Amino acid sequence: MSELKKMKIRLLKLHPNAVIPAYQSAGAAGFDLCCVESLEIPPLGRALVSTGLALALEEGYELQIRPRSGLALKHGITVLNTPGTVDSDYRGEIKVILINLGAESFSIQAGDRIAQGVVSRLSIAELCEVESLDETARGAGGFGSTGKS
């Protein structure tokens, strides 16, 4: 397997309870983000959860904030705006919007892993207005138009 490019991300702890993110396995795509304070999210409730961290990404990259699959499966906890995007020029605190889709309140303790961050290279689109678009077999069909499942 080829060597993956490693990028240094400068982190600033904004809160004494902030946890420096870590990858949990050699093949993990994302590193875990932890919360700095305890809170409870009621069923169908949402919360803006602080990580106590700010960071600086290299230009041309973004940080995607994604749900942790175990929290989603076991408790119905997910990232509301998944994937959340942290731009390379943002320097404020990284916060995560969590929603509880489960039937019971969910308690989070300071230091709990609440989401994962995935660094992704950007492609910047050049948007060009045109008079018409090329025809395709699919056409304008959407929202289930290509099959049952």
UniProtKB/Swiss-Prot annotation:
EC primary class: hydrolase
EC number(s) on file: 3.6.1.23
Protein's UniProt keywords contain Hydrolase: yes
Protein name: Deoxyuridine 5'-triphosphate nucleotidohydrolase
Swiss-Prot/TrEMBL GO biological process terms: dUMP biosynthetic process; dUTP catabolic process
Biological source species: Wolinella succinogenes (strain ATCC 29543 / DSM 1740 / CCUG 13145 / JCM 31913 / LMG 7466 / NCTC 11488 / FDC 602W) (Vibrio succinogenes)
Binding site for substrate: 68-70, 81, 85-87, 95
Record's function text: This enzyme is involved in nucleotide metabolism: it produces dUMP, the immediate precursor of thymidine nucleotides and it decreases the intracellular concentration of dUTP so that uracil cannot be incorporated into DNA.
Family the UniProt entry places it in: Belongs to the dUTPase family.
Reaction catalyzed: dUTP + H2O = dUMP + diphosphate + H(+)
NCBIfam families membership: dut, PRK00601.1
Listed Pfam families: dUTPase (PF00692)
PANTHER family: DEOXYURIDINE 5'-TRIPHOSPHATE NUCLEOTIDOHYDROLASE
Keywords: Hydrolase, Magnesium, Metal-binding, Nucleotide metabolism
Associated pathway: Pyrimidine metabolism; dUMP biosynthesis; dUMP from dCTP (dUTP route): step 2/2
Cofactor(s) of this protein: Mg(2+)
Any one GO molecular function term: dUTP diphosphatase activity
CDD domains: trimeric_dUTPase
